């Protein structure tokens, strides 16, 4: 559903003609897709960026009625989600099972959210993330033909390879690679607390660098892709502010999967 709605919004932004059947089917698909809070936020960003793009190009969307229909669906979806107690209910149940979570402050919850991205999505050598970074690195090389400009784009791959080999060769070091769903307390002075954050910082910096090499010639496109990828990472990071992080697994990274694949 996300890919279909994104495809329709893209055609609207490019003022391309949309088949009547595609336009009609986009409405129920947008309703279903927008019922998920993370996808609703991403739809909002896509519509806003499309509106800015159309405004900059001084033209109307390919189908103005469909564009505004999708916008109304998105706004209504966000309002319904904001008034829906579903997430609050699930969070309350999780806190009842893990009362220690209620004692966590802002910094601890932020750390859990960042850790969940680095440990669950990246450090597990997720195939989507691996392929995306591999293709980005190859595209940077194809564009620049300069290994010195390509090497920084490959840093996430080197990190993945290095720590995977390390964990496989030395199981005793597994304590340095904890998963957020396996810890209820940690010490800010421990090395294992900060290694994932360093990996995450280097990975994000390398991804931004790769995107700049690929899209830096068009500032609007670069910022748009950067915002979308950031929105995907944020969808995973915000989970740290809910006790459901201990039971959600990789389900919450579906939006980031979609964004990374769409960016290709």
Question: What do these predicted ranges mean?
Answer:
Residues 247-264:
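C-terminal amphipathic "assembly/sorting" segment characterized by alternating charged
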Residues 37-45, 52-215, 221-226, 232-252:
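Transmembrane catalytic cores of multi-pass membrane glycosyltransferases
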Residues 1-14, 48, 52-53, 259-263:
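Specific aromatic-rich, kink-prone transmembrane helix
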Residues 1, 31-33, 57:
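Carbohydrate-recognition beta-sandwich/jelly-roll modules
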Residues 9-30, 65-68:
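Short hydrophobic alpha-helices at membrane interfaces in multi-pass membrane enzymes
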Residues 4-10, 32-35, 238-239:
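Eukaryote-skewed repeat-based solenoidal scaffolds used as protein-protein interaction platforms
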Residues 20-37, 43, 48, 79:
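Membrane-interface alpha helices of multi-pass inner-membrane proteins
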């Amino acid at each position: 559903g996300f890919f279909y709605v994104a495809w329709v919004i893209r055609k609207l932004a490019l003022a391309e003609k949309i088949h009547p059947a595609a336009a009609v089917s986009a409405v129920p698909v947008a309703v279903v897709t927008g019922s998920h809070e993370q996808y609703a936020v991403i739809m909002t960003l896509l519509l806003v960026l499309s509106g800015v793009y159309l405004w900059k190009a001084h033209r109307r969307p390919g189908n103005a009625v469909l564009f505004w229909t999708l916008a109304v669906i998105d706004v209504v979806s966000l309002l319904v989600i904001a008034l829906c107690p579903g997430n609050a209910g699930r969070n309350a149940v999780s806190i009842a099972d893990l009362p220690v979570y209620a004692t966590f402050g802002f910094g601890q919850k932020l750390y859990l959210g960042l850790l969940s991205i680095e440990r669950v999505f990246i450090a597990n050598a997720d195939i989507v993330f691996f392929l995306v970074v591999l293709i980005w690195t190859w595209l940077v090389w194809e564009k620049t033909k300069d290994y010195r400009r390509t090497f920084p784009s490959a840093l996430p791959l080197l990190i993945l390879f290095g720590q995977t080999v390390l964990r496989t060769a030395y199981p005793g070091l597994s304590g340095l690679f904890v998963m957020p769903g396996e810890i209820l307390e940690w010490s800010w002075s421990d090395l294992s607390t900060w290694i994932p954050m360093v990996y995450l910082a280097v990975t994000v910096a390398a991804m931004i660098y790769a995107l700049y090499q690929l899209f830096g010639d068009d500032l609007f496109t670069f910022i748009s892709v950067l915002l979308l990828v950031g929105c995907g990472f944020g969808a995973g990071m915000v989970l740290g502010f809910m006790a459901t992080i201990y039971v959600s697994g990789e389900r919450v990274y579906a939006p980031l999967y979609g964004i990374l694949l769409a960016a290709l």
